[in-house]
């Protein structure tokens, strides 16, 4: 029986959704034990016969005992699975449940006397030594599962995790707050609520997106950070929307009241910035509203010196979630070493605060949670807190989601969910304690649903009774949490009623004192809002030179593999060609090899590289091969982990099939680690618009709004090659529309050596005031094009060139054609077949900032020039034409004719038929090269 007992101990204590089936099988077992599988025979025989599990019932027949046990099992399982539906988690306006499973003892034809005759072990094996009988154990379970915390965990597939949660929840435990801690907790709430009341009274109608109704969020965060400090976690990354943000800034990040009140008065808050440098607040030249701003606090207030960051955030709900995850991973990764980074999940943790309407409503949440257990993205478990005020602006839950709870969507990610009454502050603290213990044990996400209400409208100018009159009748009558908890402490004798009111008044006095320090006349005056001088120039070329032998040593190392490593023969032939630029006079470096050489030299310079995207390890077009696979064993080898004299890490991951969360993650990673060369590669550039929110609200505007620098690089495959409207265009026009104030660099290249120098220039700019995003319209067919490939001597010296020209005789040129990327190559190859010295092709490699000076200098050298043409593949209303036209119009003035050649205006980017594509493409080339 020893082995049999072990098997039972490892089996689930409850059968979840399979309980009905298991009970039917148990009936079959009673009739014929051989009718069920052997493992169930072991389990059922112990349930039926073993006194240590189920002792004989008093005064009943054995058959009745079996029936009674089955009913007890049903009751127990229902309480665990559905007790949350009757839990006391609603401070006000509890919902009316229409369909609640049976949860009472009487529902199962059981009574106290019967249950007292059954061992507590039948309820749960860990109850056997705690309670005298099943009745006592079930009372405990009812109190736990129907109390102020509602637990959902039976959906979790991992039995170890489920068992851990069951024991942690059901074992008698109470948050042991002594009287001093309770007083401190009351004071925290008084500060939280007092702050909101002061602003409400003194700045009537000003938007602040009050925390009132879910005030417990602040002490929950404080508890979380304190526990993290005890665990040695010294970097806390928080993401949240605007609801309650000002309160978190003041009471978690310790932003002085003077600074916050100054922002309401439109005076300069930076005059009150702590002189000790503990609070970092960046600001852009155009700025943002106060409830979008974040900050970084370095403090030992929570038990050890910690860095607590609240991420800047736009109004786009939930979009900050992947940014916070990326920032956390950056803090966890050690990148200043050769090889791959090492990740220590104990260095940092993410806390993401959601809204109850936005959490199930915004798909970015599901994309972000999907990153949780992936090697390239895991942060060791995120704490998710839903500030559930049970309304979204004016929309009530019945119109906001198709599920019972806003958190139901998280069940698919196998994480525990705790719903907690926001008015029961001690319960909210316990929920945090259990969540942090689970995270520490299993390194997985936990979701806490903080169920409260919204004291006022969506914003303080909004009247909620217009659309939600009935709920607000009850909310207005409902005491705030500082009074709910304060009165509880008065009743317990922890504080007196006078002490309660005295401290509430003291908070108002402190706020008034802070208010009085501010000079109302000290208004901010910055109407010009000029960008900083550091951004006056475009991305500067990196002029470092390399010897032939240096690059050859790197190349040889990248083509050297471990003994016994078996590369697919077909691939090996491709890789062996990378020796040719170094041992053949006519050898050329193609795009992929140029990238490998650039990456290797960047790693030697001490700049870490992180490259992610769908299929990025191989490359969508089978060109990169950064990760090699042994064709016999499947083992992998990454050559860029073995660069000679490597000083920083190379990290590459195939991403999940997601754009928004992955780009947000990489953006956040680079913001946190500005030395890191982060690159996101789209499978096709056409799919980049799935992350348009990140581009619009973070990447291209963050520095102007928040002073938040990023050097994230985007590789977006872009070219018209007959593959239809969804595999042709990275929507170049949209990036050029976002480009302003030297906020980025946008390129479409035609030379592998220029690509090499561009990557080095971007890497050199990182962690400087000149850093900015880089957008590369990367090639597809040009990856293997010999016109694009260049000899090695173009790599040993020189730098990035914003324009490239063919050789020409100045006095013979009558027409200049400006083109970019593949269009330039198509024109060049066509012109090579029918040479015409009167036509000069110019490759515009850098589109933004537009190379006006370089083009102007070139045109000035051409005395017989008559016409300047812009040629593009894209439709006239897309691509670069509408962007370049004002620049080129000024350059040609009335000296030359200006013409456009490209597709006509179209609603869709490209033709669907490949043959039609060829006809249109050839017509563009023919018309462009025609010399009138």
Swiss-Prot record:
It catalyses: N(6)-[(R)-lipoyl]-L-lysyl-[protein] + 2-oxoglutarate + H(+) = N(6)-[(R)-S(8)-succinyldihydrolipoyl]-L-lysyl-[protein] + CO2. GO terms for molecular function: oxoglutarate dehydrogenase (succinyl-transferring) activity; thiamine pyrophosphate binding. GO terms for cellular component: cytosol; oxoglutarate dehydrogenase complex. SMART domains: Transket_pyr. Signal peptide: none annotated. Homodimer. Part of the 2-oxoglutarate dehydrogenase (OGDH) complex composed of E1 (2-oxoglutarate dehydrogenase), E2 (dihydrolipoamide succinyltransferase) and E3 (dihydrolipoamide dehydrogenase); the complex contains multiple copies of the three enzymatic components (E1, E2 and E3). NCBIfam families: 2oxo_dh_E1 (TIGR00239), PRK09404.1 (NF006914), PRK12270.1 (NF008907). This is 2-oxoglutarate dehydrogenase E1 component.
